[in-house]
Amino acid sequence: MFARLVPRLQPQLLSKRVLTARYPMLTTTPIYHQTPMQIIKRNYVIVHRERKKEPVIRYLFYMLVASWVAIYFVANRVDKKKPPQQSFTEREFQSYEEETGLKRRNKLISHTMNSKYKFYVIPYVHDEEELKKVANLLQHKDENATVKIIDPAQLIEEQKKDEGMKYHYLLEDLDEQGRPYPPGLITAVIKQEIYKILNTREGTFDTNFIIKNYPQTTNEAIKFENDISDIQKCLILHYDMLNELPKNKTDEEQRAIKNVDGYFDSVGKSKTLVEKFDPMDKEFEEIMLEDI
């Protein structure tokens, strides 16, 4: 019986040898020592091959990249749907200055130059004659220095007319869109003008600067003293503030200008000039005596 069974089992024996060669642990008994039942039984052994596991880290990395790409496209679509910005915050304007190279890192006029260049500001003046009177008094009291009047409104108009000026396109865009000027813009324009003066022959002389209708917010006042120079005195023209300011400014603008007076008064730099009952010459003389 065994002799008849062996030819039939030769294919199985051959496959068993191959399987045993690849997996030596499957059998420890030589084939010729095994009984026919053992040989038949061993042919039914199923060998399970280990499946290679997909790297989990690589899968997570792919998912993370896909998520970033999806977020990027969604964010871009949301930005495109945003309405145009209606105003600049002070921080946004500072970013604009840094990106366009318009911002200077240091104060324009250091403390050591405060005796050479002095700055007097008038938050609100309506009567040009009063402005000239202030300039004449200042010239009379400090004959060794020249007097220079700076009008921010005039500087803004010059920027708008000249395409080569630094703030021309910004001002043009703001006006076309009906947007208010961002905090610090007027101070930046004044700073540019003062810088230009300092780099001319005019800047070699001792100079008393009078800045007309400036500052009209405390933010502008603080920015001026941070970026340009200290302010010597804030001059308040009593008559114009009392009678002309309500006629020409909104309630909010009036509060802002009066807050400027309060700001400088808190640091001892505000002086009210009352011409009707107290001669301005005497008041201004007191200012100059305090400064000497």
UniProtKB/Swiss-Prot annotation:
Sorted alphabetically, which InterPro entries does this protein's record hold? P-loop_NTPase
Q: Where in the cell is it found?
A: Mitochondrion membrane
Q: Write out the coiled-coil annotation as residue ranges.
A: none
**Transit peptide boundaries, per UniProt?**
1-26
Q: Which UniProt keywords apply?
A: Membrane, Mitochondrion, Transit peptide, Transmembrane, Transmembrane helix
Q: What is its main location?
A: mitochondrion
Q: Which Gene3D superfamilies match?
A: P-loop containing nucleotide triphosphate hydrolases (3.40.50.300)
Q: Which GO terms describe its cellular component?
A: mitochondrial membrane; plasma membrane
Regarding protein family, the annotation reads: Belongs to the AIM36 family.
The protein depicted here goes by the name Altered inheritance of mitochondria protein 36, mitochondrial
Could you tell me which species this protein originates from?
Answer: Candida albicans (strain SC5314 / ATCC MYA-2876) (Yeast)
Q: What is the lineage of its organism?
A: Eukaryota, Fungi, Dikarya, Ascomycota, Saccharomycotina
